[in-house]
């Protein structure tokens, strides 16, 4: 195992390995004041870490959920969602293109035109999954 992986990433990997196949979340519930939003995961474009919260982007709206990105990642089906950066998880079928950005960096262009940064490790992972 890579010694550079932070503890939360290792715990997320262990949680995924322990989860039986087909036992991934189908939706995310977000409390927004007095409102409760139920987001089916087939409508989730991406998630972005924001301290101890995660910003969920769906259908042109962004909702904040009190959860870490690692916690969310552990509940998602890895065949549908991929962590492309320490701060981003993206739904694979929303990615339309990968473009170079600067000397050694890349960005993922999503179906709605959003540009999401992709780390070097995320780029390698994406290339494997998209081929």
Residue ranges and their predicted role:
Residues 2:
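Active-site-proximal cofactor/substrate-binding loop regions of enzyme domains
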Residues 7-117:
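Conserved binding/recognition cores within well-folded domains
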Residues 119-130:
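Short, basic/aromatic-enriched C-terminal tail that caps enzymatic domains
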